[in-house]
Amino acid sequence: TIILTIILAFTGMCLRPPLMIPFVLAKSQPIPGTTLDSDNAWNDRFRAIRWDNDSDRWLLSTSEGFISVNEDFTGRPVKIPSSTTPPVSPMGITVFEKTTPGQWLIGSFSGLYNWNPATDKITDYYSGQPYSPAGKGRPLSAHLISGYSGDFNSQEPVVFDYYKGAENMPEMPDILRDQPMSLWNFALELHVGRAYEPIIGPFSELFVFLSGLTLLIILISGLVIHNRHHRRQKQHKIITNKK
């Protein structure tokens, strides 16, 4: 039972940063016989698809990057070089919208960018500055974009930030502001550690990792002490029987 609990604690730690990041970036072969073991080339790679009127082709967002395909998918898919496309977080694309002719808005936890596939021009949505790769590091931006909508009755589109919430939204009505949080949402906030952010600040992101590490130390040290105590008792019985 304790071995199973150790496995559960460690695998749970891998579902949140920092252990999650190397697992997300790493690639491995699927386990034979599982749902990921498929002959379909798009299986677990396809993320989103949009029709591009300017090029009369489909634009696809995949785990391998952006791909261009002709209208009826009879031609060979063409992978667009990553150096000419906006960065997309391993967590997946969250905004894939055409704003004006030739212009696309691409968003993810790696930021929000304006992209012109024809000219390969990429600019930051907030600063307007040209995008330049930052190199290897944490695959997250200062703006963790979780959604976008241009359907609200407002002058500016509404961008949803993971931490800041919705931008350019009208003030929340009192009837909604005073609504209590559901028990499910409250339990989720406790589970991932976000509920502790007012207390421990940015360390709340490490809550799952630190609590899992503490649990592992307790379990492993307890297992070691238990085994030592068991061996001593066994040796004591052997000595007693010999006497």
Kindly give the residue locations of the regions a language model identified.
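Extended, hydrophilic extramembrane loops/domains of integral membrane proteins
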Residues: 103-106, 113, 152-192
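Repeated scaffold domains used in trafficking and secretory/extracellular systems
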Residues: 37-51, 84-101, 129-152
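Internal alpha-helical transmembrane segments
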Residues: 1-30, 193-242
